[in-house]
């Protein structure tokens, strides 16, 4: 596959989720997210702070953006959005829920900004910079309507239990790799979920130990002679307890990063892989359409040839006998059937040619999209793992510095 350059025209940060009260015409409260974006200058240099544009969008705005892009670019892998509701959270306005969604929405926009086609869309540019988004959204309401394609949905259901007869080696390999990647990312997700729970439990235990040490410190410093060895012991206990408190706080910070960002990155990657699989399924549907039309054309040609040669199927034999009893001219009826079949074959030939062109074109675009997905995936995993390593290095470096000072003072 040819090298495709990712888009690097936008730097985007989603932050500061805020609960807002709905007006009288709206239903209930909602959360807005601050989107800070700026265009990248030539030579991969960041533009100045004056070029930063700040807008506020709610989740339904993201949904509209996704729907329009999915409708306008059916051959592209449009990154998925996080689910509107998550069963784990009863309160969708809680800090934990909104902060995690905030990071996930940032991943969504960054993927769009990296896509060489989607990043050029007018709707994305308007979404990122327009201060009059509400008016723009209302103008779209009448034209957009329900963006779901009913014909495509019906086609998907009809082809759900069918498979492609001749799958290219490239797509066989793509399906195998995506399946393995999905499995591995899911395993890592579950593993780090357990890590977070374990670290939170350890941090809580360190906190309890700190309380016990504080009580012990108070006990040993209640004597009359504050300058005695017992008083010295109290000072050392206090110093040691400060180190334990620092360890507990730092461990909680590390767990918070893993829970709020790294695990979210993993789950977003799982959803992104699923979107890629959906595009491959759509490609397969185009291939199935072509194969079924080809089979139908072959059957029609065979039926026409059988009539020309004077042979027919068993059902045609009984039908011709019935027509003979009713006084229908067999030869005239045969010629009429042949004529209809010739017209049918001619129309089907055109349909098969068109279906072949559509299937080939969609396959070509799907291969490009898979390459784009691979590049974005590689970049994301590299960034995510690097940041994870940096947080662990920072944690252990802080612990080395803290306990080195404590050791000296003890």
Curated annotation (Swiss-Prot):
The transmembrane segments are none
Q: Which PROSITE patterns match?
A: PX
The PX domain sits at 11-135
GO annotation, biological process: cytoplasm to vacuole targeting by the Cvt pathway; early endosome to Golgi transport; endocytic recycling; glycophagy; mitophagy; piecemeal microautophagy of the nucleus; protein localization to endosome; protein transport
Q: Which GO molecular-function terms appear in the entry?
A: phosphatidylinositol-3-phosphate binding
What stretch or stretches form a coiled coil here? 329-368
Topology versus the membrane, per the UniProt entry? Peripheral membrane protein
What InterPro entries is this protein classified in? Answer: AH/BAR_dom_sf, PX_dom, PX_dom_sf
Cell location: Cytoplasm, Cytosol; Preautophagosomal structure membrane; Endosome membrane
Gene Ontology cellular component terms for the protein in this record: cytoplasmic side of endosome membrane; cytosol; early endosome; perinuclear region of cytoplasm; phagophore assembly site; phagophore assembly site membrane
Q: Which residues bind a 1,2-diacyl-sn-glycero-3-phospho-(1D-myo-inositol-3-phosphate)?
A: 58, 60, 84, 101
Please tell me whether the keyword Coiled coil is annotated for this protein. yes
Alphabetically list the UniProt keywords.
Autophagy, Coiled coil, Cytoplasm, Endosome, Lipid-binding, Membrane, Protein transport, Transport
Q: What does this protein do?
A: Sorting nexin, involved in the separation or division of vacuoles throughout the entire life cycle of the cells. Involved in retrieval of late-Golgi SNAREs from post-Golgi endosomes to the trans-Golgi network, for cytoplasm to vacuole transport (Cvt), and autophagy of large cargos including mitophagy, pexophagy and glycophagy.
Recorded family membership: Belongs to the sorting nexin family.
Q: Any idea what this protein is called?
A: Sorting nexin-4
């Amino acid at each position: 596959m040819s090298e495709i350059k990712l888009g690097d025209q936008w730097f985007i940060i989603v932050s500061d989720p805020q609960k807002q009260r709905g007006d009288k015409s709206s239903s209930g409260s909602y959360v807005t997210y601050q989107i800070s974006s700026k265009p990248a200058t030539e030579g991969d240099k960041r533009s100045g702070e004056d070029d930063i544009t700040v807008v506020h969008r709610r989740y339904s705005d993201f949904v509209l953006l996704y729907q329009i892009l999915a409708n306008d670019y059916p051959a592209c892998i449009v990154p998925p959005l996080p689910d509107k509701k998550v069963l784990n959270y009863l309160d969708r306005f809680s800090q934990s829920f909104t902060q995690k969604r905030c990071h996930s929405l940032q991943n969504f926009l960054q993927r769009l900004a990296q896509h060489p086609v989607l990043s050029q869309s007018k709707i994305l540019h308007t979404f990122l910079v327009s201060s009059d988004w509400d008016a723009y959204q209302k103008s779209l309401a009448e034209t957009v309507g329900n963006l779901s394609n009913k014909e495509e949905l019906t086609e998907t259901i009809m082809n759900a239990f069918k498979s492609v007869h001749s799958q290219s080696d490239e797509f066989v390999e793509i399906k195998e790799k995506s399946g393995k990647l999905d499995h591995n990312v899911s395993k890592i997700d579950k593993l780090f979920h357990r890590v977070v729970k374990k670290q939170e439990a350890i941090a809580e235990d360190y906190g309890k130990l700190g309380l016990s040490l504080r009580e012990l410190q108070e006990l040993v410093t209640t004597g009359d002679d504050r300058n005695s060895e017992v008083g010295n012991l109290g000072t050392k206990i206090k110093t040691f307890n400060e180190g334990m408190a620092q360890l507990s706080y730092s461990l909680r910070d590390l767990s918070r990063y893993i829970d709020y960002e790294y695990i979210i990155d993993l789950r977003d990657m799982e959803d992104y892989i699923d979107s890629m699989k959906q595009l491959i399924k759509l490609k397969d549907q185009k291939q199935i359409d072509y194969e079924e039309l080809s089979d139908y054309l072959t059957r029609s040609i065979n039926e026409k040839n059988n009539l020309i040669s004077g042979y027919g199927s068993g059902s045609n034999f009984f039908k011709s006998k019935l027509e003979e009893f009713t006084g229908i001219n067999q030869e005239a009826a045969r010629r009429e059937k042949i004529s209809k079949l010739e017209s049918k074959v001619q129309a089907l030939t055109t349909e098969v040619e068109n279906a072949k062109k559509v299937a080939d074109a969609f396959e070509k675009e799907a291969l490009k999209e898979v390459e784009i997905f691979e590049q974005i995936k590689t970049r994301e995993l590299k960034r995510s793992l690097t940041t994870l390593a940096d947080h662990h290095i920072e944690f252990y470096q802080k612990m080395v510095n803290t306990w080195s000072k404590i050791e000296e003072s003890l």
